[in-house]
Each structure stands twice: as C-alpha cells, then as structure tokens.
Amino acid sequence: VSRRIRIGVGPVDGRSPRYGIDQLDTVLDGMWWGDNVLWVVDDGLSSVDVVLAGVIALADGRDVSDRGFSRGAFDLRDHASIGAVADTACTVVREGKTALWICPRSSVPPALRELAQVIVDQNSTHLRVERADGRRSQVVGTEMPYAVDDGIATVGPPSTVSRLGAGLRSIRKQRGWSQADVGAMIGVSGSAISQTERGTQSLSLDTAVELAERLGVSIDHLVHGADRSYELSRPASFGRGPSRLAPSSPQHFRIVAFATMSLSSSSTGSVSICIGSGVVKLEMADDSIVLGPGDVVRTTGSELRACRNLSAHPALIFQVNEHS
C-alpha cells in the first residue's frame, strides 16, 4: 500500500455496515452512515488485507460519486489525486455513504485526516482507535491486540491498560486539565500520565485507586471515562434515528467555502446546531466533530467555539438556543 490510498464503499441497501471484526464493531458500534473511516497502517504492512477482509468483501460495487468507482486507488504523488480524495470524502458525508480509506502512515493526506470521523491506527500487533466522532469519549485510545495465523486474523478484546488510559484522558479533557496537572495529584510526571493515556504504561492498582480518590470518582468511572459534551443525531434515511430541532426560532448562518465562523451562545440551557447543507467541523471546548446535511448536535452554549467549512461549497447551519 506504499504511497497509495484505497477506498471501499459499504453496502447502501439499509443494512448496518460493519467492520466484520467483532471487537471493533462492539467498540465503535459498527460503521455509521455518513462516516469516512481512515485506516492508517505501517508502510508495507501485509496484514491489513487479512484484518479488513470482512469489510472489503462488503464493498458492494456502488458508486460513491459520479467518479465511477466504489473500490479504487489514488496515487498520493499526484496533486490532482489528493484533491479528488478530499472531494470524495466530502461526498461521502453529504450523501450519507460509508467509506473506508486505507492509507500508509507516511502519506496520509491532511485533508482526509481533517474529514475523517473515525481513525483507526494499525501496526504489526495492535489496532488503536485515534478518533471516533459521536461515540463514547472513552473509545478514543482503545487498543486491541491482533494476530494473523494461516491467513485468518484474530482480534482480542481491548486491553485494560488502554481502557484506563482512554477513560483518564476523557475525564482530564472534560475538566480542562493538563497531563502535568493530573500527574501532580499523585506525584508523577506529566510524561507518565501521557504514557498511561496512550496505553504504553500502566498505573499500579494502588496508584489508580489514589488517582480515582483525588479525582473524586470511582475506579469504574475512571476506567469508563466521562461522557461526551454533546449528543449527535443523524437523518433516519442514513439508517439511524430521526433528527429534529427544538421548537424554537433558529438563527441561520451561511459559511463560505473553507471559512471559519466563530460560534458562541449566552443560552443558559442546551444549544442545538443543525447542518442544512455542506460539510463542516464543529469545534467545541474540548472536542470537535465532522458534520453533514441533516446532522444535529446538542450541547451547551459554553462548549461552542467555532464552525469550519471543510468543503468548496457554502455551508448552511442553524443554531437553536433552548433556554432553561
């Protein structure tokens, strides 16, 4: 796969698309319509096709756009191909498709990393979830070991170490603390907390208990992490639950191509952001999410920061303040 990127488009007949990897499907709640999944692999890694055999087999031959492909390759040495990657990824979001992009680590297009709602990193021994828009916050950082034997891949359950790291990361980010802040609570360095969050180093049981006490949470809460600061709904036509705005008069904004608009709200209650058209990234205090037409995010006014148009077309968004 060196210096090339491949795309597979999942089934579009109403079935819920899956990775075909039980552990990953459980962690990520399968694939979601409208998602670009970026699968980053070590250059020359041969096991990627075995691990992804299930989802590759599901690519059903339907076109993701008028480019006329459902499985294809882009040469990342070609600037025109890189532009086509971004255009196609935007089409996936706009039209409620599901796309899996397999890309060598040394050649990940920045635009695709920006647009991907899910990012999975695969090395020779582990799968690691790097991004997971809309899923539980503790999913990010989850690692699963895998092995390939006689052409068959076996993926193990998430490691306890990675679950603890992911949970700690979500609590820390929700509270706006640095890794050094957390380390100071239990007398370790910020670097040690960083290694814990990445799953490369485990805290002892005594230290984990002390940390939970300092944070004012249970060990179970520490492992499972904090909830997301937002709720996401998508159109029923994408195979998910219905979306609706609160019964209020929304403000509407038009964002020109590739522009960023500052967002804020004085609302003392919840705020709903609905995407009328376009592909945008909603920036919040400690999180962000890529959104397409019909997507609705419910959060609080204090969380909102900005909305960035990721495509070459204008975006229309609506903001509804739900006063308490």
Regions found by a protein language model. Give the residues of each.
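Short basic helix-loop element that most often maps to the first helix and adjoining turn
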Residues: 166-185
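Glycine-rich P-loop/Walker A and Walker A-like loops and their local beta1-loop-alpha1 context
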Residues: 16-63
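Phosphate-binding/switch region of NTP-binding enzymes
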Residues: 103-151
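Ligand-binding loop in jelly-roll beta-barrel domains
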Residues: 301-324
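Glycine- and acidic-residue-biased ligand/ion/polar-headgroup-sensing regions
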Residues: 268-285
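A short, N-terminal "cap"/entry segment at the start of jelly-roll beta-barrel domains
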Residues: 205-257, 263
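P-loop NTPase motor core
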Residues: 66-114
